[in-house]
Amino acid sequence: MAQLPPEDIATMPAQKVVFNAPFDNKATYYVRIINPGTKRIGFAFKTTKPKRINMNPPNGVLGPKESVNVAISCDAFDPSSEDTKGDRVTVEWCNTPDPAAAAFKLEWFQGDGMVRRKNLPIEYNV
């Protein structure tokens, strides 16, 4: 049987993550992930700057019509001495093989199953 692709997710905000100056303290921005679909999904966050950007929770499972708030934190840094072009967070998601799965498993993303991605660029307002 062919595997069905994961349905769309929604994020709020939908387009980007914004951090405002000053950058001398840790700042946190919240992103809501919504699974409007009919299947349980596993999700995982990645970033281009893992030493500066952290996500909590970094992964999880969402049932149909469920949502979760994810805290995206930016550690203190000097924007004049660091390249911030291309900074982004990416949320990846896939259908869970077991419709009753409650715990995230990294192996869902490592096989030949279908994984979808949504990039959220990071904007730094100096």
Swiss-Prot record:
Domain of life: Eukaryota
Cellular compartment(s): Cell projection, Pseudopodium; Cytoplasm, Cytoskeleton
Gene Ontology CC entries for this record: cytoplasm; cytoskeleton; pseudopodium
Domain MSP: 8-125
Keywords noted in UniProt: Acetylation, Cell projection, Cytoplasm, Cytoskeleton
Modified-residue entries (N-acetylalanine), positions: A2
Tissues in which the protein is found: Sperm.
Keyword Cytoplasm: yes
Main location class: other
Free-text function comment from the UniProt entry: Central component in molecular interactions underlying sperm crawling. Forms an extensive filament system that extends from sperm villipoda, along the leading edge of the pseudopod.
Protein name per Swiss-Prot or TrEMBL: Major sperm protein 1
Species whose genome carries this gene: Globodera rostochiensis
